[in-house]
């Protein structure tokens, strides 16, 4: 059966089922006017000449093209969709009165697709209602926060047949799904401007022959896809081969197709009209489409911002994500032309950070000129708003001029006449976090007891050596320093601050710089100036090991809460071990 014959026959079948909300592809009108194909179908007995309806034989002829099932990908955190994605997955937001994923499932079921599998990850429990409501199946992607959607498709490999591949956050103006599909395809539309989507080139039969990013205009991929079994099998073979390499771990599945087009079975573009398929990558895009989100987002985060600035929701705009920090997640927003940054506290941080203490420290830091960016912080929930500084640089650990700038700030900070009744105690705090870890996994810490013993010994050696406590920052690694164009230095993020040992601030800068012993001694000498002596130097070198150990245990705890710490965890372990062994 030719593509034209299939399209005509399938259209008549859809009319026979009394579907009225079909989303037509661009080529449909032209194909339906193909009288030669129509006559061939009549001649084969697939269309009744008198009634113009599909016959039983025609329906039987469609059977080899039946769609078996659908897979809906709903595992990702949609980090570009801040701030709403911090509260719940994008697929669960209502658009025009219906949740995105509910609408898509209902459209699939209306088209006769009853076998639907949803791949879950981020906030998966919020989707559980779908099982009872729609009788869908679930697959769980535990790697949703470290791998992209190829992992979701690979985990669903046993469901792959003649299958729709869907994203939970697509919005179709009408129903694009059918009980029968002719060939493997990806939906797409023509755009007249540059976007961040994948552009495609096609041949005369609309087979995709090239895929590329960054064109000025053309056909882009957008919406659902359909894979026939041979295409799915080859895709999964390629995905399997990449699992030991990880080249595509951070990429969308389209990239694997792009790089292997010649090896894959034919893959076609099904073009739709403009403005019938929508993807809301950013919250501002959703606001343009559904006006309820201009004034009534029903978002706790937006409400928080409103309460601070006493403004209408519509004035809060231009949301942009910030690369996730080690402790929290943040995003930028704008009010009346001024950019601010909102910090959303990370999971598990309530067990290791006292937010009322942090707020007091932020007030002190602003009062004394160390952090003029602070606007507001909520001590109950831990969210914070600051002025966004768009242009600055971080210090260069190997640049002596930068070192002098940093040390000048630290000397001034450690000299302010401020005393508070809280502060970081890296040894004791590490023991507390170890207890939290061991509650989750009693055996997780066994191999680190020798290092723990050395750090404990160093701590005891520094307790009575005369170094006085003072007001400290507690988290002096490079990303918390801003050197502005006028060389003014700002120190941000005061979560770990308080009345503590100054070795914490000096030691952590050394740890993050991964200084060798001679570089660390030079840094300590420059900090202490005329107060330098061997005993003082030992104290700060010891605290380099102690604070590295603290952050190592902290990283283990954060990973136990689901965070991804990467190589930092190992670097902290190595620096703690290296300095402890050197000093003992």
Language-model-detected regions and their locations in the chain:
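Active-site acidic catalytic loop and adjacent metal/ATP-binding pocket
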Residues: 320-342, 457-506, 518
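An alpha-helical support segment within catalytic cores of ATP-dependent transferases
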Residues: 300-315, 418-474, 485-486, 576-580
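Conserved core of the sugar-phosphate nucleotidyltransferase
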Residues: 7, 173-248
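N-terminal nucleotide-binding beta1-loop-alpha1 segment
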Residues: 16, 51-86
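Conserved beta-loop-beta/alpha segment of the NTase-like Rossmann-fold superfamily
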Residues: 125-198
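ATP/Mg2+ or Mg2+-diphosphate-binding catalytic cores
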Residues: 284, 290, 294-298, 553-584
């Amino acid at each position: 059966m030719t593509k034209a014959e299939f399209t005509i026959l399938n259209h008549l079948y859809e009319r026979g089922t009394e579907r009225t909300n079909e989303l037509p592809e661009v080529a449909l009108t032209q194909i339906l006017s193909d009288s030669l194909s129509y006559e061939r179908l009549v001649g084969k007995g697939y269309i009744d000449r008198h009634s113009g309806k599909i016959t039983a034989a025609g329906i039987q002829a469609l059977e080899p093209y039946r769609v078996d099932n659908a897979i809906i990908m709903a595992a990702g955190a949609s980090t570009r969709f801040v701030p709403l994605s911090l509260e719940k997955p994008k697929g669960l937001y209502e658009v025009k009165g219906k949740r995105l994923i509910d609408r898509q499932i209902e459209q699939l079921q209306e088209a006769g697709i009853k076998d639907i599998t949803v791949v879950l990850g981020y906030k998966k429990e919020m989707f559980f209602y779908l099982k009872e409501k729609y009788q869908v199946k679930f697959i769980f992607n535990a790697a949703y926060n470290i791998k992209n959607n190829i992992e979701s498709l690979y985990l669903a490999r046993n469901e792959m047949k003649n299958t729709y591949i869907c994203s939970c956050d697509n919005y179709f103006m009408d129903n694009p799904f059918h009980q029968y599909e002719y060939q493997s395809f990806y939906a797409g539309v023509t755009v007249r401007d540059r976007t961040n989507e994948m552009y495609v080139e096609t041949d005369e039969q609309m087979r995709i022959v090239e895929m590329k990013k960054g064109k000025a205009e053309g056909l882009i991929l957008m919406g659902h896809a359909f894979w026939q079994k041979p295409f799915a099998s080859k895709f999964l073979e390629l995905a399997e081969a990449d699992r030991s390499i990880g080249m595509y771990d951070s990429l969308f599945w389209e990239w694997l197709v792009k790089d292997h087009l010649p090896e894959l079975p034919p893959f076609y573009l099904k073009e739709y009209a403009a403005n019938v398929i929508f993807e809301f990558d950013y919250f501002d895009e959703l606001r343009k489409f559904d006006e309820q989100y201009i004034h009534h987002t029903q978002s706790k985060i937006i409400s928080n911002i409103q309460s601070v600035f006493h403004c209408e929701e519509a004035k809060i705009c231009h949301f942009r994500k910030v690369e996730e920090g080690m402790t929290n997640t943040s995003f930028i927003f704008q009010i009346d032309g001024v950019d601010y940054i909102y910090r959303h506290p990370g999971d598990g941080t309530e067990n290791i950070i006292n937010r009322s203490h942090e707020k007091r420290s932020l007030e002190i830091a602003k009062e004394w000129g160390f952090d003029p960016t602070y606007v507001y912080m909520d001590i109950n929930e831990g969210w914070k708003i600051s002025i966004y500084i768009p242009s600055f640089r971080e210090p260069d650990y190997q640049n002596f001029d930068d070192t002098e700038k940093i040390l000048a700030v630290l000397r001034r900070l450690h000299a302010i006449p401020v005393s508070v009744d809280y502060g970081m105690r890296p040894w004791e705090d590490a023991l507390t976090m170890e207890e939290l870890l061991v509650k989750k996994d009693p055996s997780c810490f066994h191999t680190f007891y020798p290092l723990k013993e050395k750090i404990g010994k160093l701590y005891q050696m520094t307790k009575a050596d005369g170094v006085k406590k003072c007001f400290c920052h507690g988290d002096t690694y490079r990303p918390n320093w801003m050197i502005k164009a006028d060389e003014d230095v700002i120190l941000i993020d005061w979560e770990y601050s308080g009345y503590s040992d100054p070795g914490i601030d000096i030691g952590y800068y050394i740890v993050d710089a991964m200084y060798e012993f001679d570089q660390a001694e030079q840094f300590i000498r420059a900090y202490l100036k005329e107060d330098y002596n061997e005993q003082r130097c030992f104290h700060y070198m010891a605290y380099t090991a102690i604070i590295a150990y603290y952050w190592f245990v902290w990283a283990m705890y954060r990973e136990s809460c689901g965070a991804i710490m990467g190589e930092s965890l190992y670097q902290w372990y190595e620096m703690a071990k290296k300095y402890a062994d050197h000093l003992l």
